[in-house]
């Protein structure tokens, strides 16, 4: 939100009680009817928020709910993002790991069924939890929705060649899901590296100063290798002005802070750790 600074990608709505009640009260329906009714229930839930007293919704929440209503009508949700200084990566629910192989994105962050307010979670969490609830009753229901956050790199750089690659990447996935007719888009032959959300690691600046970022985005870092230098100009004549920062584990650098000037505690880098091939 440009006024409040609130991240409205963390303002989506989820009512887990709706899932619990639905799983208890709709067991008599076949799979197709159950899925259709649940999709409508999700839309109605969002409508109830949008149609409530207008003074209860700020601008960010209203935008989020309107987007969510559109998304609940779909079977596939791709939330396209860019970051200040970032490599391409994909947020993928663990149940859809196989589908991640159809995007031409080398770095995949596998996320659990916990809801944390994001667009992709608002779409897959209800279906995932419904499937789990019905499984507890002895009924298997496939998860009807796939939702991903597709991080397309740095927002400060426009590269039309990369934009074409990104489009082909998305078309490859959509072709895999049989959205396209007579399409030839297929995934690139690349190695994809994955990391679980709990192993997605934020590295905070231990001191403030001017930063030279060394770890390349998308690059594999070995434990003990330099990731950045921090320069403290006021220490030039009295003590060591340059401090080299290292990481104590192997990692892949995914993004770093947008400025070369940081305070102590600034989120300097984010890394994949405990990496495995997908």
What kind of feature is each model-predicted range?
Residues 1-278:
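Structured catalytic-domain cores with a bias toward divalent-metal coordination
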């Amino acid at each position: 939100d440009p006024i409040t600074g609130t991240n409205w990608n963390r303002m989506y709505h989820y009512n887990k009680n709706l899932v619990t009640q639905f799983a208890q009260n709709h067991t008599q329906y076949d799979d197709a009817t159950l899925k259709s009714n649940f999709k409508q229930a999700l839309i109605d839930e969002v409508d109830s928020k949008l149609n409530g007293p207008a003074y209860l919704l700020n601008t960010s929440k209203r935008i989020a709910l309107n987007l969510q209503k559109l998304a609940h009508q779909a079977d596939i949700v791709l939330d396209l993002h860019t970051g200040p200084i970032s490599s391409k990566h994909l947020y993928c629910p663990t149940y859809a790991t196989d589908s991640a192989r159809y995007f031409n994105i080398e770095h995949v962050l596998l996320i659990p069924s916990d809801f944390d307010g994001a667009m992709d979670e608002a779409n897959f969490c209800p279906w995932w939890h419904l499937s789990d609830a019905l499984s507890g009753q002895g009924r298997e229901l496939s998860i009807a929705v796939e939702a991903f956050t597709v991080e397309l790199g740095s927002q400060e750089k426009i590269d039309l060649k990369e934009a074409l690659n990104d489009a082909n990447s998305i078309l490859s996935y959509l072709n895999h899901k049989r959205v396209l007719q007579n399409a030839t888009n297929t995934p690139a032959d690349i190695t994809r590296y994955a990391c679980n959300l709990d192993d997605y690691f934020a590295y905070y600046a231990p001191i403030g100063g001017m930063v030279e970022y060394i770890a390349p985005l998308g690059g594999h870092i070995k434990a003990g290798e330099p990731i950045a230098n921090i320069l403290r100009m006021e220490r030039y004549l009295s003590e060591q002005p340059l401090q080299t920062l290292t990481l104590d584990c192997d990692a892949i650098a995914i993004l770093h802070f947008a400025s070369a000037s940081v305070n102590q505690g600034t989120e300097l880098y984010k890394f994949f750790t405990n990496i495995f091939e997908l």
